[in-house]
């Protein structure tokens, strides 16, 4: 397993899947990577891997929309390093189950909308990496269609297409409509970037780094001139010598240190 922050934090699904390629694949620890995939796959429930494993004897928690999608991305990287499609074949039924649950609906309002995009969220529950919560107050709730979640969803579908082709099954997993809906609805022409969130009340124009996932995942959703504009926007508003801000200083909600 991987610990999110020894000794304060235990196993977190999101952190594990994001860190796994760097910790296990680049370093040649492929057996350990395989064991981690198996451990999380064994705890898939209603199409979701755990957000975290609490202390011994306690049930896993599932309040995350992105950890399960990062599982696909990490597995794809594993296959690029190992070519171990026999292992992917073992996970294939679980992967198909995950996609089915996301299409029909699972916990916390996570489901595919009529446009093919993934929507998620309910009051009082934090589901994305922006998961700060003070008492009952979710600081950044992001209920609706977050930009990075839909980039991850698109990548999960493209990875399913790749695996289906390898396994001689129907490779049409519905990725193309997601790409079309994403580019139509997330593009913010006013700033030359992507909306951070789509909601029934309208899009959220907050300039955040989440939009970068539409460019940086294995299967990019945005390319060419739009991609260049996004990078320029992020560089102008978010880049610092210490990394990326999570919100543009021009935003009314921005709080400096």
Task: Locate predicted features.
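Extended glycan-interaction surfaces of carbohydrate-active proteins
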Residues: 1-11, 35-57, 61, 68, ...
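Well-ordered alpha-helical scaffold segments within catalytic/enzyme domains
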Residues: 9, 17-30, 70-87, 151-168, ...
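Short acidic alpha-helix initiation/capping motifs at coil-to-helix transition points
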Residues: 11-15, 155, 173-174, 207-209
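Short coil/turn segments at secondary-structure boundaries
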Residues: 24, 58-66, 86
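Generic short alpha-helical segment signal, independent of protein family or function
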Residues: 24-28, 38-45, 54, 76-80, ...
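Extended, well-ordered alpha-helical scaffold segments
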Residues: 28-42, 85-104, 152, 156-184, ...
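Active-site cavity-forming subdomains of large catalytic enzyme subunits
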Residues: 66, 70-76, 80-114
């Amino acid at each position: 397993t991987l610990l999110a922050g020894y000794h304060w934090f235990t196993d977190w699904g999101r952190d594990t899947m994001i860190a796994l390629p760097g910790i296990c694949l680049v370093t040649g620890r492929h057996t350990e990577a395989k064991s981690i995939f198996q451990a999380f796959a064994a705890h898939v429930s209603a199409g979701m891997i755990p957000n975290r494993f609490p202390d011994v004897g306690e049930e896993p928690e599932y309040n995350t929309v992105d950890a399960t999608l990062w599982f696909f991305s990490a597995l794809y990287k594993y296959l690029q390093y190992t070519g171990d499609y026999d292992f992917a074949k073992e996970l294939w039924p679980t992967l198909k189950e995950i996609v089915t649950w996301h299409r029909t609906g699972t916990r916390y309002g996570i489901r595919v909308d009529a446009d093919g995009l993934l929507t998620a969220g309910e009051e009082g529950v934090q589901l994305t990496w922006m998961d700060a919560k003070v008492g009952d107050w979710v600081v950044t709730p992001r209920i609706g269609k977050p930009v990075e979640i839909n980039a991850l969803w698109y990548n999960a579908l493209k990875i399913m297409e790749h695996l289906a082709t390898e396994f001689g099954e129907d490779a049409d997993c519905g990725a193309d409509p997601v790409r079309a809906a994403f580019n139509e609805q997330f593009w913010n022409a006013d700033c030359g970037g992507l909306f951070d969130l789509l909601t029934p009340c309208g899009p959220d124009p907050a300039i955040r780094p989440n939009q970068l996932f539409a460019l940086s995942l294995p299967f990019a959703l945005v390319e060419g001139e739009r991609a260049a504009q996004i990078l320029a926007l992020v560089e102008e508003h978010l880049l610092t010598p210490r990394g990326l801000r999570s919100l543009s200083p021009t935003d009314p909600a921005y709080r400096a240190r």
